[in-house]
From Swiss-Prot:
Family, per entry: Belongs to the CDP-archaeol synthase family.
Positions of transmembrane segments: 4-24, 51-71, 81-101, 112-132, 138-158
Lineage: Archaea, Methanobacteriati, Methanobacteriota, Thermococci, Thermococcales
PANTHER family: CDP-ARCHAEOL SYNTHASE
Organism of this sequence: Pyrococcus abyssi (strain GE5 / Orsay)
Name assigned to this protein: CDP-archaeol synthase
One of the record's GO cellular component terms: plasma membrane
Length: 168
């Protein structure tokens, strides 16, 4: 498999998981409106249970579809679902960590945090999936370079679709 294609194919569940809460989110905030000891919200209204579990579900379904399209990539449905679930969970945990850090830095909801927004979910996803499946270092480096561009393009698209209030 072409290394560039493989890098994208591998990380696709995380990309979908990270972007799905924009459409699927809403409802009860993960932090239930509670504040941290600094008096600021833990995560904020933008991180909801519906978005979190919706994102994990979408990412896991994407991985399942990938297996059905190319069964040889993972070798088994069990491994495909496991990797997709861990990539998705990792992406959303990384996004939550980013929100936590942004609240501690007193950054308002939706405010862009260059690097944190683009690499936090990616690095966390890769770490979570590491026990089941990895990709070569060169592919990881490629993803570190292209993910900020893809993230920006996805945000502009979501803004134009009126799914987001700001294009970042």
């Amino acid at each position: 498999m072409n290394p560039i294609f493989e890098a994208f194919w591998y990380i696709l569940p995380a990309y979908f998981a990270n972007s799905s809460p924009v459409v699927l989110g809403g409802g009860t905030p993960i932090d239930f409106g509670k504040k941290w000891r600094d008096g600021r919200r833990i995560f904020g209204d933008g991180k909801t249970w519906r978005g979190f579990f919706g994102g994990i579900t979408v990412g896991t379904v994407v991985g399942t579809i990938q297996h059905l399209m190319f069964p040889g990539y993972y070798g088994s449905l069990k491994l495909a679902v496991g990797v997709a679930f861990l990539l998705s969970l990792g992406a959303l945990v990384g996004d939550l960590i980013g929100s936590f850090i942004k609240r501690r830095l007193n950054m308002p909801r939706g405010y862009p945090a260059v690097g944190l927004d683009q690499w936090g979910f990616l690095i966390s996803a890769l770490c979570f999936a590491y026990p089941l499946r990895t990709i070569p270092t060169g592919e990881v480096l490629f993803l570190l370079v292209v993910t900020p561009v893809i993230h920006w393009l996805a945000n502009v698209f979501a803004y134009r679709m009126k799914w987001k209030n700001v294009p970042w």
